[in-house]
Structure formats: C-alpha cells, structure tokens
C-alpha cells in the first residue's frame, strides 16, 4: 500500500481543525467549546454525534462526545480527549496558550501535543475515507475527563455503549506516544499503577521523656525500607521491571523537642503483567504486618488502583499500525509499554487497543507545540490505518 499524500488544500486540513480546538480553553473539566468544534466538522460527514454527560459524587460533571459513522462491523474507534492540563505559570509562555500561534512551522498552544492535534488528524483521515465509502463503522470516543479524575469520561462512555449492546472491534488512542520523531514509538500496552497511603500511629510526647511517648518514625522508616528494598520482578518480554517509589513522607511536626504522634507516607508502584493491584496490596500489607509484629505499634493503610497492567499481544492489528507509520514516516516504530497510564486502560476490557500519536517532548509544558508537518503526517498515518483496516488487514 502506498502512503497517501498530505492534503493541506483539503477542506478538512487537520491544521485548521487543530487550531480551532486549541483556541477552546478546555482546561479539565471544562469543555470550553471543543466538543462543539468537533460536531461542526463531523456532522457534515454523516457522523451521528451524541453528547454524554456524566456525574459522580465528589467529582465535576463532565461532557463527552461519541460520534459514529455507519452502523455495521467492523467497527473502528478512535479514542481521545479534548481536555487539557492548566496553563501553569503564564509568564513562562512566550505565546498565548490558547491563541494557536504558528511560528517556524510549529503550532503552539495548550493541547497542541496532548492531544488536540491528534484528534484533528483523525477527523481529517475519517473525512478522506468517508468520501470514498467503506464497509463498517468509524467512531470517535472523545472525553473531557482524561486529565482529571478519569471517572466521568471514557470508562462511563464504554459502559453506556455496552449497556445498549454497541461493540467496538478495534481501537486507536491518539496519545502522544512518539519520542523524538513522529512514528518512532507506539504503545501496545501500559503498566498498572497503584498508590498506597500509610499512617503509622504513635503517642506524642517530649523528646526528653521518650519512655512516656511512642515514636512512630522508626517503624515507618523500617516499613519503607523493606518495601523499597524488595525486588518485585525482573521484567517480562514486553514490560520493564515493576518499580516502587516512595513519593511522600510527612511527619507533620515542626518542633524539634516533640516526638510526633503519627507519621505518614505514600508509595506508588508501576507494575507489569506479573502482578495485579490486588496482589500488590496483599504483598504490601504483609510487609507492614511483619514490621508491626517485630516492632509493635499499629498502622492504617489504604490503596487505590488507577489501572491494571495490560498488553495487546503483537499481531495483525499492531502490525497494521506499525506498517502504516513506517509507510508514512520511513521509521520502524518500537512497540512499547513504557510511560504512564492512559484511557487505554479502560478500553482494553472492550477491544484490542493500540496508541499512536505525536511526539511528547513538550506536553504539559509551557510553550507546548508540535510540527505542522507532523499533524498532517499523522492524518496520513491514520488514513493508511483505516484503509488497511477496512481492507481486512487487521485480522
């Protein structure tokens, strides 16, 4: 298959769409008009656009968009988000974060890399395919809650689709997976992530009278030492070794002559598919119990799993995407599971999912930007994937 030529003169130039999206101040959880921009571009192509708004106690309400063209199978879905992280320190920017300035062949603005430009690229690719016709369905699953708690977005959209027996066959997520050059890395899985909050109880007292107090700090330090020293695994064929990091230690004591009454710490484990959140919770509690049995005292501990490890086994679907990237860019992408979590962790329970998007060097930074040519090339990659997919090359 020959890679399609970039089409900047097309009425669906992805740059135009990206500029419109970046000009929407959609700092999570605010929609900022971005979903309306997408509806404006998608509806004329025949996409049925459906707003999905979800709520949950203690979290902000979130607007999301599900747009589908066609009703049959195979059903190819693009998942992404239009919410962005806050600007941060405004004077660190050399441009207006929401002006979508173009300088020296690069598009600047919050969301340029993560990931409004990728959303724009897929819309442009879908327009090209829709003009020629295809057998099956194309959809976009766009959330406004990826950069936030991730409670009222992709996960609930997928649950709603499943409740009405609407299935997705394969999915691409447009996260910025590339490292140095467009197409040099795609994600075929992600590590899991579990946070743990530990509080060791003691008895506050004067440092001159330690026999009248109970210092929790030595017990906390021993617990953290044992957790940190343990080698969880050596990695697998597709994953790095699992890793625990102590992320905070807080005694809450500013006085030098007071033994604290409690000591707290948090830990995070990024883990591969040799573990689950439940198995790691059990292991950590075992370590804490052992220290408590030896040193006395008491503790409280809670955990939260933001995502389990998963892998989309290399096969026809990942090969289709890798080949499309190579055809357009000339680069053979690395199939990787590195990095943080993404909404692919929710999608993997419903369909095979692979992530491919723009270079990620400037995401979440001041002066976030991406190359104009890269936006158009990414549209070419997505178009090549869609052509191959509906030609049956994913199975």
UniProtKB/Swiss-Prot annotation:
Keywords: Amino-acid biosynthesis, Cobalt, Diaminopimelate biosynthesis, Hydrolase, Lysine biosynthesis, Metal-binding, Zinc. Binds 2 Zn(2+) or Co(2+) ions per subunit. InterPro entries: ArgE/DapE_CS, Bact_exopeptidase_dim_dom, DapE_proteobac, Peptidase_M20, Peptidase_M20_dimer, Peptidase_M20A. Pathway: Amino-acid biosynthesis; L-lysine biosynthesis via DAP pathway; LL-2,6-diaminopimelate from (S)-tetrahydrodipicolinate (succinylase route): step 3/3. Signal peptide: none annotated. PANTHER family: ACETYLORNITHINE DEACETYLASE, N-ACETYL-L-CITRULLINE DEACETYLASE. Catalyzes the hydrolysis of N-succinyl-L,L-diaminopimelic acid (SDAP), forming succinate and LL-2,6-diaminopimelate (DAP), an intermediate involved in the bacterial biosynthesis of lysine and meso-diaminopimelic acid, an essential component of bacterial cell walls. Homodimer. This is Succinyl-diaminopimelate desuccinylase.
């Amino acid at each position: 298959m020959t890679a399609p030529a970039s089409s900047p003169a097309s009425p669906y130039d992805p740059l135009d769409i990206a500029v419109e999206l970046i000009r929407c101040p959609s700092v999570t959880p605010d929609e900022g008009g971005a979903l309306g921009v997408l509806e404006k571009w998608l509806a004329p192509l025949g996409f049925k656009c459906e707003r999905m708004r979800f709520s949950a106690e203690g979290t902000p309400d979130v607007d999301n968009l599900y747009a589908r063209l066609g009703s049959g199978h195979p059903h190819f879905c693009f998942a992404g988000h239009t919410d962005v992280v806050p600007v941060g320190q405004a004077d660190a920017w050399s441009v207006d974060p929401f002006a979508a300035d173009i300088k020296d062949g690069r598009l600047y603005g919050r969301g340029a890399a993560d990931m409004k430009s990728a959303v724009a690229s897929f819309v442009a690719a879908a327009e090209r395919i829709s003009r020629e016709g295809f057998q099956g369905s194309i959809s976009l699953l766009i959330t406004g809650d990826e950069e936030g708690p991730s409670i009222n977005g992709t996960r609930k959209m997928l649950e709603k689709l499943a409740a009405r027996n609407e299935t997705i066959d394969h999915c691409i997520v447009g996260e910025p997976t590339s490292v140095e050059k467009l197409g040099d890395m795609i994600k075929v899985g992600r590590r899991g992530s579990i946070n743990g909050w530990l509080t060791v109880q003691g008895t506050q007292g004067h440092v001159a009278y330690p026999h009248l107090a109970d210092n929790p700090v030595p017990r906390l330090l021993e617990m953290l030492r044992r957790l940190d020293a343990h080698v969880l695994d050596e990695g697998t064929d597709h994953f790095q070794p699992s890793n625990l990091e102590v992320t905070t230690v807080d005694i809450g004591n500013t006085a030098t002559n007071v033994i604290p009454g409690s000591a707290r710490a948090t830990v995070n484990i990024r883990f591969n598919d040799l573990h689950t959140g439940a198995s790691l919770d059990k292991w950590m509690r075992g370590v804490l119990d052992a220290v408590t049995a030896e040193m006395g005292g008491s503790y409280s501990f809670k955990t939260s799993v933001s995502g389990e490890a998963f892998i989309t086994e290399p096969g026809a679907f990942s090969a289709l995407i890798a080949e499309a990237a190579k055809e357009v860019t000339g680069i053979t992408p690395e199939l990787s599971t590195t990095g943080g979590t993404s909404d692919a962790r929710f999608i993997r329970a419903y369909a095979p999912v692979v992530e491919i998007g723009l270079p990620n060097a400037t995401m979440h930074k001041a002066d976030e930007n991406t190359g104009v040519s890269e936006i158009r090339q990414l549209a070419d990659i997505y178009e090549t994937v869609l052509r191959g997919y509906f030609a049956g090359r994913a199975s």
